[in-house]
Amino acid sequence: MRVADFSFELPEALIAHYPQPQRSGCRLLSLDGPTGTLTHGIFTDLLDKLAPGDLLVFNNTRVIPARLFGRKASGGKLEVLVERVLDDHRVLAHVKASKAPKPGAELLLGDDESIRATMLARHDTLFELRFDDERDVFTILNAVGHMPLPPYIDRPDEDADRELYQTVYSQRPGAVAAPTAGLHFDEPMLAALQEKGIEMAFVTLHVGAGTFQPVRVDTIEDHIMHSEYAEVPQEVVDAVLACKARGKRVVAVGTTSVRSLESAAKAAENGLIAPFFGDTRIFIYPGYHYQVVDALVTNFHLPESTLIMLVSAFAGYKNTMNAYQQAVAEQYRFFSYGDAMFISRNPRAPQEKVSP
């Protein structure tokens, strides 16, 4: 399967650089997986598309201000993007510099260069850094870090992004990118869903910077997926099994919830799904048989990305690419701060041939 099969033309003007003034004020493109039928609407229409007893599964990760600017003590400027917090004082990070720091190098971080850190070791593309500070990593990042806006949002981060690039239900700090489908849910919307009898459960997947990495191979099967930490606790497993038992739908909010649930399904030795705590490299592309997820709320994704491949595996390749063409024609807003889709699973998708 070729990566180029997942390409589409996207005018620059359709990339959203700011969210809508109201979280739930975005547009919603609904795709019926079995038929391919498209319906245009607004995000609050989701209330009418869900039935009492359906289960919404959210990702409650919280984005950390993971980007730091500074310099090496020896002089050269650098930019640090924390990928993973290892403990109170150590992190794994991407480092952008004209010359990569060597083990033992001292770094001066923060806009005022008040934070001292030491480069301990290099692990492939990541650098292990230790903050030489009494405060823990999260406190330091909250004090001097910048919100890690995606590379396609071509502007500096602003104070408002600390709230806007964060779901209202986020609880577990550790992500360097927001689970963006969740950005559309505000408190009134969550209250309305509860009032209708929609069940809710929360997984955690700390989204890494790898989510924005382009696929650098020509053939999909050759791609090595980045690793992210996920947790699917027993209460989520129980909620999923209860939902299936009552004949209702498991609706994943975002591709990170999909990857968490399907990782937990793969880990189950007996039964449909089991608790999961660990790193996942699950790579979902056409041909994949979904085990748990029946419907999906998601944003519009980058051409040739692993996420449009995941959606194609869910809705069917032709349905997905047609929906994206329609979204461009109708001028939907794309990517993290853009509009949303609601998709029901196409049971025939795993057998469909991918051909443009």
From Swiss-Prot:
Instruction: Please indicate which superkingdom the organism of origin belongs to.
Output: Bacteria
What EC number(s) would the UniProt record show? 2.4.99.17
Pathway connected to this protein? tRNA modification; tRNA-queuosine biosynthesis
> Where in the cell?
Cytoplasm
User: Which GO terms of type biological process are on file?
Assistant: queuosine biosynthetic process; tRNA wobble guanine modification
Predominant subcellular localization, coarse grouping: cytoplasm
Q: Which UniProt keywords apply?
A: Cytoplasm, Queuosine biosynthesis, S-adenosyl-L-methionine, Transferase
In terms of Pfam families, this protein maps to:
Queuosine_synth (PF02547)
> Sorted alphabetically, which InterPro entries does this protein's record hold?
QueA (IPR003699), QueA_dom1 (IPR042118), QueA_dom2 (IPR042119), QueA_sf (IPR036100)
Q: Which GO terms describe its molecular function?
A: S-adenosylmethionine:tRNA ribosyltransferase-isomerase activity
Write down any Gene Ontology CC term.
cytoplasm
The first-level EC class reads transferase
**Catalytic activity of the protein:** 7-aminomethyl-7-carbaguanosine(34) in tRNA + S-adenosyl-L-methionine = epoxyqueuosine(34) in tRNA + adenine + L-methionine + 2 H(+)
What does this gene product do?
Answer: Transfers and isomerizes the ribose moiety from AdoMet to the 7-aminomethyl group of 7-deazaguanine (preQ1-tRNA) to give epoxyqueuosine (oQ-tRNA).
What the record says about family reads:
Belongs to the QueA family.
State the oligomer form and interacting partners. Monomer.
Q: What is this protein called?
A: S-adenosylmethionine:tRNA ribosyltransferase-isomerase
Upper taxonomic classification of the species?
Answer: Bacteria, Pseudomonadati, Pseudomonadota, Gammaproteobacteria, Enterobacterales
Q: Which gene encodes it?
A: queA
